[in-house]
Amino acid sequence: MGIYEELVARGLIAQVTNEEEIREMVNNGKATFYIGFDCTADSLHVGHFMALCLMKRLQMAGNKPIALIGDGTTLIGDPSGRTDMRQMLTEDAIKHNAECFKRQMEKFIDFSDGKALMLYNSEWLKPLNYIEMLREVGACFSVNNMLRAECYKQRMEKGLSFLEFNYMIMQSYDFYYMFQHYGCNMQFGGNDQWSNMLGGTELIRKKLGKDAHAMTITLLLNSEGKKMGKTASGAVWLDPNKTSPFEFFQYWRNVDDADVLKCIRMLTFMPLEEIDKMAGWEGSQLNEAKEILAYELTKLVHGEEEAEKAKAASKALFAGGGDTEHMPTTELTNDDFGGGSIDVLTLLVKCGLAASKGEARRLVQQGGVTVNDEKVTAIETTFGCEQFTGDGVVIKKGKKVFHKAVLV
């Protein structure tokens, strides 16, 4: 089985410009491909994780990845999938975010000896002359066609700035520039990028009379059709300081039964033959599959040692074994205990398990809070500071969120 057939079998391919030519290129290690990453945050998240895994798979098959850091396009802002205009970042913030991205990407992609490239599109976008850009590139784009693009159609009613309207041209120019200067013949991206990617292949065809290719990656959706990779508190990040290895592990450990095998197939590097054998698993076997998923992905992102720690902490919660050392923890001081105690509502807010005392009150009243295996039913419940010494207390929110609080 070639790498293209494997990508199809794993359900990773959504759309392609020319399946036959793309198959021949990637199966024979002839693709120099790029994926762009705009620097809108100081960490990559689960959505980027799929792209990084795809780059790793294709590199292992002999193809050459280009990780394009969009420090230039971030100054414009991608309207794809947005109902409002992105917050504009300063150049210093973008530079900081780009450095964070670089450190995380190096865990997945081998950049040694020219096996992969990391490029910054500000290097060619910033020096562009506006009039020259309009004449040389703008003339190749039809406004009528651009307005039919899904990313723009979604924004027309609420307003689309001229700044954002230029994003497709900028992304297309990236592909055109790298095709000329780095031999980049293929672009990969999320399904919401399809219009922008076609803009690049068309620009190359019109300006150079040559063919380039595009392929989109299937969005990671749960069985209800909602994007995965987000929790009630926000995105699931790859930075351990934003989403701890334990929280990352728990996110995947708690996926729905209907989604676990799809996630294993799309995200892990387990052989397809092994995954196919799991197709008939049910009941307790599905819990085993979830643990395999969580362990494999945590190992990929955070390393084997952190994956083992997260697994041990998870077992402490679900099987009564292991330890709680690596559970997300809030450190309390004596100042937090007025009169030597702390009430449950304040405790929930301090630990970040509720955004406000009002939300904490609702959690308790709905029976969603357990402390050290005892359900809290009264909002007036208090805990003495002595309970938080030693191993501290374990707070459970709902069925799947665990947190430890200790006195320091």
Model-derived features with residue positions:
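Positively charged, low-complexity intrinsically disordered leader regions
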Residues: M1-F33
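Conserved nucleotide- and phosphate/pyrophosphate-binding catalytic cores
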Residues: I204-V408
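Divalent-metal (Mg2+/Mn2+/Ca2+)-assisted nucleotide/phosphate chemistry catalytic cores
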Residues: R10, T90-E91, N97-T216, N222
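Short acidic, glycine/serine/threonine-rich loops at helix termini
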Residues: G77-G81, L128-L134, K226-A232
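Short, hydrophobic/aliphatic alpha-helical segments
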Residues: N28-G36, P65, S172-H181, L221-N222, ...
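N-terminal catalytic cores of NTP/NDP-binding nucleotidyl/phosphoryl-transfer enzymes
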Residues: E21-P79, F188-W194
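A charged helix-plus-loop insertion that forms the helical arch/lid used to bind
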Residues: P79-K95
